[in-house]
């Protein structure tokens, strides 16, 4: 537990202190955000606000993780922790390239769809292949070929190739979902912090009730490799998001950009796979799912009927164009995100209770 607290504290401090440094550097370099034409009127004042703030989140997350390992725990970094951090960083690099092209070309279009998908594909395949390696002494690998809800669903197995395909779909889906949500000051960062806080609790609970515990399996135990290190990653990332939110809250002094949104989406996907909660993540990160679905529904309905289902997609812009103040949309969406996240945590705990009762 001490390692989680130290990692989170370091990440929080680094994020709060490093972000204003990036604001000054990016402002001098002219690394300002371009605004979508559809929202130019309401977001015109945001044009030129420094972007690529996701760099601060990544640096803070890594700093928290490494300092905790160097100062608190005698254990080296684990395969699960490094794989999730590596996936997060790889997608952050894809997002950084996307942001950089937008800035250089002075438009709101960066990498083309093919280049972005290829970047996500490479990161996803590397993660999926490596996550099926590095079995511990009990034969448990960071990820599993089985689909999972709160635990592996043993009757549903993807196989090696199928898991790689599934991982790509999950990682690209979550990274794009967070990217869609990042359209208002602090919306994606605040929501991600809530989801990550839930994953600190989940992974620490899995550590306390692990099937590979030195003193023998706990009641209703979890077959997860490196749960304590996963909790450290989630805690450092959560604190990094909170520190960044200090500067990203409305009115934002900096945006996370695709650097941050793609990285955080990859982080959520990676956490869901290494904790065996892939389907539960859909509930915990429900706001991200709704935002992504609103884009899909808008496209499908428009192509079918030539009419728009929403005033504008993603969903948060629909309410903004309906006359809601931006801060009102953000706070109400945060409330919905918190409800969804807590409901997911409740399902996780209810599953443990139902299985634990069988032993009494």
From Swiss-Prot:
Its EC number is 2.7.8.13. It is a multi-pass membrane protein. Its cofactor is Mg(2+). GO terms for cellular component: plasma membrane. It catalyses: UDP-N-acetyl-alpha-D-muramoyl-L-alanyl-gamma-D-glutamyl-meso-2,6-diaminopimeloyl-D-alanyl-D-alanine + di-trans,octa-cis-undecaprenyl phosphate = di-trans,octa-cis-undecaprenyl diphospho-N-acetyl-alpha-D-muramoyl-L-alanyl-D-glutamyl-meso-2,6-diaminopimeloyl-D-alanyl-D-alanine + UMP. GO terms for molecular function: metal ion binding; phospho-N-acetylmuramoyl-pentapeptide-transferase activity; UDP-N-acetylmuramoyl-L-alanyl-D-glutamyl-meso-2,6-diaminopimelyl-D-alanyl-D-alanine:undecaprenyl-phosphate transferase activity. Pfam families: Glycos_transf_4 (PF00953), MraY_sig1 (PF10555). It is found in: Cell membrane. It comes from the Bacteria. It is an enzyme of class 2 (transferase). GO terms for biological process: cell division; cell wall organization; peptidoglycan biosynthetic process; regulation of cell shape. The chain crosses the membrane at residues 3-23, 52-72, 81-101, 115-135, 153-173, 187-207, 230-250, 254-274, 282-302, 333-353. The keyword Amino-acid biosynthesis does not apply. Pathway: Cell wall biogenesis; peptidoglycan biosynthesis. The keyword Transmembrane helix applies. Keywords: Cell cycle, Cell division, Cell membrane, Cell shape, Cell wall biogenesis/degradation, Magnesium, Membrane, Metal-binding, Peptidoglycan synthesis, Transferase, Transmembrane, Transmembrane helix. Belongs to the glycosyltransferase 4 family. MraY subfamily. Catalyzes the initial step of the lipid cycle reactions in the biosynthesis of the cell wall peptidoglycan: transfers peptidoglycan precursor phospho-MurNAc-pentapeptide from UDP-MurNAc-pentapeptide onto the lipid carrier undecaprenyl phosphate, yielding undecaprenyl-pyrophosphoryl-MurNAc-pentapeptide, known as lipid I. NCBIfam families: mraY. This is Phospho-N-acetylmuramoyl-pentapeptide-transferase. The gene is mraY.
């Amino acid at each position: 537990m001490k390692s989680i607290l130290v990692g989170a504290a370091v990440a929080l401090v680094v994020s709060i202190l490093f972000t204003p440094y990036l604001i000054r550097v990016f402002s001098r370099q002219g690394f300002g955000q371009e605004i979508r034409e559809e929202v130019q009127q309401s977001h015109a004042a945001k044009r030129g606000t420094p972007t690529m703030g996701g760099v601060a989140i990544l640096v803070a997350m890594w700093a928290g993780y490494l300092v905790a390992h160097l100062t608190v725990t005698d254990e080296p970094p684990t395969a699960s922790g490094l794989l999730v951090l590596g996936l997060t960083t790889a997608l952050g690099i894809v997002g950084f390239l996307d942001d950089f092209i937008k800035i250089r070309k002075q438009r709101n279009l960066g990498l083309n769809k093919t280049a972005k998908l290829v970047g996500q594909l490479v990161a996803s395949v590397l993660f999926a292949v490596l996550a099926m390696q590095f079995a511990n002494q009990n034969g448990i690998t960071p990820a599993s070929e089985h689909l999972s809800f709160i635990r592996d669903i043993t009757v549903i197995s993807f196989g090696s190739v199928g898991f790689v395909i599934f991982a790509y779909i999950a990682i690209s889906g979550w990274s794009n979902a967070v990217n869609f949500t990042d359209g208002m000051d602090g919306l994606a960062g605040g929501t991600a912090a809530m989801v990550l806080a839930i994953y600190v609790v989940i992974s620490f609970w899995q550590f306390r009730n692990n099937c590979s515990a030195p003193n023998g399996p706990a009641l209703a135990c979890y077959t997860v490799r490196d749960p304590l290190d996963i909790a450290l990653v989630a805690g450092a990332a959560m604190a990094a998001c909170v520190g960044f939110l200090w500067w990203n809250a409305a009115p934002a002094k900096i945006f996370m950009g695709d650097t941050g949104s793609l990285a955080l989406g990859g982080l959520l996907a990676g956490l869901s796979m290494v904790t065996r909660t892939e389907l539960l993540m859909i509930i915990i990160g429900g706001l991200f799912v709704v935002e992504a679905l609103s884009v899909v529904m808008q496209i499908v309905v428009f192509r079918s009927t030539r009419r728009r289902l929403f005033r504008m997609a993603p969903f948060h812009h629909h309410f903004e164009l309906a006359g809601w103040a931006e801060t009102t949309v953000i706070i109400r969406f945060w409330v919905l995100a918190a409800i969804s996240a807590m409901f997911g945590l409740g399902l996780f705990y209810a599953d443990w209770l139902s299985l634990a009762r069988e032993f009494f």
